[in-house]
């Protein structure tokens, strides 16, 4: 089971932590884990390379935990509102995509020990 916890401050998403293994298939062959990893790196690269924002990320393969946070989503740290909206929009879009997948989880054959869940933690940066 993978848990994706989104970090939010004053209603603005600024990061997330992914932990665990979806267990839809064997480690290394799981399309859901591959999707989560791909979207995660897309978000990191977009913040750094496209929007010129500040992003920190940590990948702990031993514990299967990935943490991504960006101050550029928050008005206290980023003056350019276009960057703020773009960065926070990436996090919000990821959240909504996962939320939508959970609404249609009958399309996937998860066992009781596999799948994913999403949470939101209101936490200052």
What positions do the PLM features span?
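Short, conserved glycine- and acidic-residue-centered signature motifs
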Residues: 32-36
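N-terminal intrinsically disordered, cationic/polar leader segments
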Residues: 1-30, 45-125
